[in-house]
UniProtKB/Swiss-Prot annotation:
Free-text function comment from the UniProt entry: Transaldolase is important for the balance of metabolites in the pentose-phosphate pathway.
Localization of this protein: Cytoplasm
Pathway where this protein functions: Carbohydrate degradation; pentose phosphate pathway; D-glyceraldehyde 3-phosphate and beta-D-fructose 6-phosphate from D-ribose 5-phosphate and D-xylulose 5-phosphate (non-oxidative stage): step 2/3
GO cellular component, one term: cytoplasm
Active site per database record: K136
Name of the featured protein: Transaldolase
Organism of derivation: Nostoc punctiforme (strain ATCC 29133 / PCC 73102)
Entry GO MF terms: transaldolase activity
Major place of residence: cytoplasm
Family note: Belongs to the transaldolase family. Type 1 subfamily.
Amino acid sequence: MSKNLLEQLREVTVVVADTGDIQAIEKFKPQDATTNPSLITAAAQMPEYQGIVDQTLLQAKKDAGDGATQAQIVSLAFDRLAVAFGLKILQIIPGRVSTEVDARLSYDTEATLTKARDLIAQYKAAGIGRDRVLIKIASTWEGIRAAEILEKEGIHCNLTLLFGLHQAIACAEAGVTLISPFVGRILDWYKKDTGRDSYPATEDPGVLSVTKIYNYYKKFGYKTEVMGASFRNLGEITELAGSDLLTISPSLLAELQSTVAELPRKLDPAKAASLSIEKISIDKASYDKMHAADRMATDKLDEGIKGFTKALEDLEKLLADRLVRLEGEVVASH
C-alpha cells in the first residue's frame, strides 16, 4: 500500500502543527506546535475554547487584586492566555510548543528579554521545563540580540518573521535554537510585485529562499534548526521535504494526509556540504545594509509586525469585552 505525503514527509522532516486549535492538534498528532498572536486570537474566538479564555480572565482578576482596573486585568490575562493555550497543547504533543513575545516589543531588546523570561516563569510554575518551550521573537536586529542572551540563559528561541539570508545568518551566529523562514508570505510579495498569478513550486521565491538558508546552515555546520513556515500550497511543502522541521496549517496537513504520491527528499545536508557557497559574517552595519537592500524582507518584516500587533489589539479588545460580560454574570448571579 502506497504511503500518503504526510507519512513520507514525517520520515525526513519533523512535522509541526501551525495552529492554536487544540482539536486540530489532537487529530494530526504533530511532534511540535507553533502559535502566534493571530492564531491565539482566532482560537480565543472559537466557542470550544471559551472556557480557557474565561478561566484565564477570572484568575487574572483574582490575582490583580481588588483595586485593579479593567486594563490591568486584561493586560495580565493577555500575557497568560498564550501560555494557557500552550499548556493545553503540551498535554497532547510529545515535543515543544512555540509561544510568541508581544510583537510590539520587536525593536526593544530589554523589553523582549523581560517578557520572554516571564513566559518561561509561567511555564515553570505549571511544571513545564525549558526544553519543551520555544520563545518566538521577530527577527529584527534587536530581537536577535535578545535571543542571543536568552539562549545563554538556557531559554530556547524560535526566530520568526524571517524573510532574508541576512536575518538567518545573524540568527545562526547568535546561536539561536531554531528559525522560522516564511515561504508563502515571500510568494505573496513577489506575486504582487511582478503581477504574476502563480509560480511553479520549483521557482517559488519562498521555496528558493528557504532552500538557500538551509544549504547555508548545513554547509557551514550551524546547529540552528530550519523550520519552514507560512505555506500557501502543497507544492511549497513538497519542495522543502528534508528541512529540519516544517510547520503546517491544519488544512494543508489534511491535504498532505489525503494525497498518495511519491515524495522525493529535496533538502539534504550531504548535498548542501558539496555546494560552493561564500561564508559571510553579519554585524549591525551589514545587517542594516542588507536589510535595506532587500525590499521584500523590509516590507514583509514591517507588515508582519504590524499584522501581529493588530491581532494583539483585537485580542485585548476581545478580553476586555469578555471581562465585562463575565463581571455582569457574577453580579446577576448574586
